[in-house]
């Protein structure tokens, strides 16, 4: 482990105490919890609890709050994972792809990965016809795209954004 990573871990560990961890875990479970209920669960009075939450937000530890939507009820039941391989030889191909993908609301996640391909994308669509349209009119036309491989998810076994904090 590099010295920089060790320093970051020490800094993070010093910045968060056991009560901060409890607050973060409760907010991960229920982002709509009231400050009064949160303070009871973590063993603080409401004012210091709220001050800690505000500090965690200001520090960027808490990045925001979101509603989890049911894609089945919102005409986006088909989850598709796409591998993207870029052409080699253009010096700015990764930067151009990164900039272009940011503008696509249809793409829920985009990860630059190591291995046999370059990017892993996650998208949700109504059906295969909609995905074929997205692939043909959008994904294949992104800067530097050389090859794609598509995986249609048959069953979502587990989906969570919960971070295990200790």
From Swiss-Prot:
Tell me which UniProt keywords the record has, alphabetically: Activator, DNA-binding, Transcription, Transcription regulation
Subunit field text: Homodimer.
Q: What is one term from the GO cellular component aspect held by the record?
A: cytosol
Q: The HTH asnC-type domain covers which part of the protein?
A: 16-91
| One Pfam family here | HTH_24
The name under which this protein is listed is Leucine-responsive regulatory protein
Protein origin, superkingdom: Bacteria
């Amino acid at each position: 482990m590099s010295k920089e990573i060790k320093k970051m871990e020490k800094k993070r560990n010093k910045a968060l105490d056991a009560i901060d961890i409890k607050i973060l875990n409760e907010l991960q479970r229920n982002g709509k919890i009231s400050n009064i209920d949160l303070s009871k669960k973590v063993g603080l009075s409401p004012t210091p609890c709220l001050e800690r939450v505000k500090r965690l937000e200001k520090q960027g530890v808490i990045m925001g709050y979101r509603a989890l939507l049911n894609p089945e009820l919102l005409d986006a039941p088909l989850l598709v994972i796409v591998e993207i391989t870029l052409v080699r030889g253009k010096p700015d191909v990764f930067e151009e792809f990164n900039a272009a993908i940011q503008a696509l609301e249809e793409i829920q996640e985009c990860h630059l990965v190591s291995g046999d391909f370059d990017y892993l994308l996650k998208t949700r669509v109504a059906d295969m016809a909609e995905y074929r349209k997205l692939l043909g009119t959008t994904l294949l036309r992104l800067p530097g795209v050389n090859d794609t491989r598509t995986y249609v998810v048959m069953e979502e076994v587990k989906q969570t954004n919960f971070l295990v904090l200790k």
